[in-house]
Amino acid sequence: WDSNQSILYALLSCISFSILLYFTFLTIYKFISKIQFSSVLLEITGKARLKLWGYIFLCFFILWFPYFIITNPGLAGNDGMHQINELFYQKTFDGYFTLTNHHPLFTTLIQGGLIKLGLILFHSINSGVLINSIFLNILTISCFSFLILTIIDFYGNKLGLLTMMFFGLFPIFPLWANALDKTGYFNAILSLFLVSIINIDGGKRNKSSIALLIISGVLLGLIRNDGLIYILAVLIGSLTLKKKRNILISLASVVFLIVIIGKILVFSTKALPTEPMESLAIPMQQISRVVKYNPSSLTNSEKTTLNKFFHYSNMAKVYNPEFADPAKINSRWPYRQFVGTYKARKEKYDNQNFVKNKKKFLLTWIKIGENNKKLYFEAFVGENLFYIYPQNHPTIYFWMPGTSTNTLFVTKMFKNYKLNRPELFSKLVKNILIATNLPVLNLLFISFTWFFIWLIESLVIINTNKLQYLNLVFLGAAIIIVELLSPLSGYLRYSFPLIELVPILGLICFVKIKN
């Protein structure tokens, strides 16, 4: 990115590789589109169903128990600590954390309640983190067991077993089931949401399926701030369903409930809204690139305007093509300076330039872009390339939860937090890091892989006229859009929902269900 020659080389190599990928894609597609298995729809009910669910739960427990021991009492990374520090208004070196919806308020309250329980019963932050890990493990294993049971219903025991082994052995799922973080909760609830969609698309539209759709959908939207996008995508994709009225009404109700419950939570807890910069990763990156590589194109008026939103003198220095957080942190947003009553905090929030003058920022962004289209395009590509380009870019600590060494988050509440077996966790990290660099195996840890597979599966589903499953295809598209709007390039954590969805789409592609 440092010179026109380098950019030209990068573009030519990208085009060449894209042509190669295109023909590879066509070859793979032509081969796999001819693959078809058949499956008989099973009706497992009563005690037999409960017993089978118990066996699946036990298998997951055995596969995931080593992670529970290694990570005991649980992995508290930056995001999890951030949420708890906000809930308990902890002091740090540059001010005070205050409750916001930056990380979903719903998960902040759940995790905070479990931490509080540990503090009350055992007077220990480690106990609180352990209680969260136990609860999240039980929740995740229960939900994934339900998903496998549903797969067995439609696709048989063998494919159910294979899917279970994938989820059981892929380290991201057990690791995040032991994390003080919203992501583990999202993984669990997404599996329940997938259960409801599989049942509905497969013709099982009884009251329990509709109820599960509504409950899991609402939880999905509350656990992640982008969850609403996923629900809307499924709603649009469900327009192709036959006898869709009840499904569309249910999904519309989910959207309504997410918005209403979210507002109630913010109002009742007196939490501040998410800072506006969270949704401005690409504009911030594009402007920062112009400041670094073509500052002469900016007028004095534009520089003055930018200086009201950012520390202008630092913009070029902190710019990172693949990571938007430095640009966000360089803003003039008064992090950890919102103190006092809710009225005082909200008044200070409303008086920030990114809130009261957001329109002016967006107009300035558009105006600067008119003279810097090339730099804007480069910034967009740099911010998103590794989601749609097959380069080994796993960077393990970018997607794996872990103990934080960041003194900003290690407040008085977390000063005594520690892993019981840090040496075992270090060995685990080292071994996973080795796996992310082994040929073929490393493909599992590259975001592009899951995008590529989703693309093939989606085309097979469309071309074989299985349009009742288009809502799941749209769900995958929404996940990719969220990836492209995220502040990191190739960050595998944003691909977790796609990793969960891809095996389901694979079954839909290649298995014909017989009643």
Can you say where each PLM-predicted feature lies in the sequence?
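Short helix- or helix-capping micro-motifs
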Residues: 60-63, 163-171, 217-221
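Short acidic/glycine- and proline-prone juxtamembrane loop motifs at membrane-interface regions
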Residues: 78, 175-185, 223
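Extracytoplasmic catalytic/substrate-binding loops of multi-pass membrane glycan-assembly enzymes
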Residues: 71-85, 95-114, 122-127, 497
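Transmembrane-helix motifs of polytopic, lipid-linked glycan transferases
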Residues: 19, 23, 131-155, 192
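Membrane-proximal stem/loop segments at transmembrane-domain junctions that anchor or position
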Residues: 271-418
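Membrane-interface anchor segments at the N-terminal boundary of transmembrane helices
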Residues: 127, 131, 368, 378-473
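Loop-to-helix entry region of an early transmembrane alpha helix in multi-pass inner-membrane enzymes
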Residues: 9-11, 101, 105-109, 119-145
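Transmembrane-helix signature of polytopic, membrane-embedded enzymes
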Residues: 53-55, 144-169, 187-188
